[in-house]
């Protein structure tokens, strides 16, 4: 995993590494800090074992509910929290609620917990954003906000169908049939290449196939 506070488009170390790394799954995040300090420990993605987690958005009123959220993290996981970002706390809440066993359920319970604690403190819309998490084999992505106005999230259409529509596009000949991209905003200007994920939904990309399902936060189970 490579993390840096340097701008990705001007990071020579990243450029050098990218030319020598190959993988069946890449996880990348370029962000502008909102409220948290600009430091490497706050850079996405966050990792626990083989799990990676990143988030585009924010927990509204995080300073007011941070203590409530942090003390809900399982005591065996708590020492791993190194930074001050709301995303890292959300990640460890999801781990506490069973991310390694059932990612959709754990994320639903983590966000449900954030919303419950936020509303108890008078915060109308506690959560905003999109989430991506992976175990290195499969990818889970979520689009949800308390207000129902989430950050955008797009995924690519089937590569084989795109090849038939655009037989002269060299880039489509260079990728495999099972290639998928999930991004915050469309990359490039190829008409029909991108599909926007619906509001309040989650997707799964795995060897068994792709799924797109509704997402609803849940009341969390007891954490201890």
Q: Where is each model-derived feature located?
A:
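Conserved short alpha-helical segments that host acidic/polar catalytic motifs at enzyme active sites
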Residues: 1-55, 59-224
């Amino acid at each position: 995993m490579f993390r840096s506070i340097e701008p990705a488009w001007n990071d020579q170390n990243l450029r050098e590494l990218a030319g020598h790394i190959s993988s069946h799954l890449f996880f990348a995040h370029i962000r502008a800090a909102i409220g948290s300090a600009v430091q490497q420990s706050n850079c996405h993605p966050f990792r626990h074992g083989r799990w990676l987690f990143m988030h585009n958005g924010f927990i509204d009123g995080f300073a007011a509910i941070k203590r409530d959220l942090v003390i809900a993290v399982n005591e065996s996981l708590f020492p791993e929290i190194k930074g001050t970002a709301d995303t890292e706390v959300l990640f460890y809440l999801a781990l506490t609620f069973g991310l390694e066993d059932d990612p959709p359920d754990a994320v639903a319970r983590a966000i449900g917990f954030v919303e419950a604690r936020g509303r108890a403190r008078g915060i109308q819309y506690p959560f905003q954003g999109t989430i991506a998490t992976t175990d290195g084999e499969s990818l889970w992505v979520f689009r949800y906000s308390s207000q129902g106005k989430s950050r955008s999230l797009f995924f690519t259409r089937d590569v084989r169908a795109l090849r038939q529509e655009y037989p002269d596009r060299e880039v489509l000949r260079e990728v495999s049939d099972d290639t998928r991209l999930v991004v915050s905003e469309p990359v490039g200007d190829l008409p029909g290449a991108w599909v926007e994920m619906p509001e309040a939904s989650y997707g799964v990309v795995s060897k068994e196939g792709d799924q797109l399902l509704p997402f609803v936060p849940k009341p969390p189970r007891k954490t201890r």
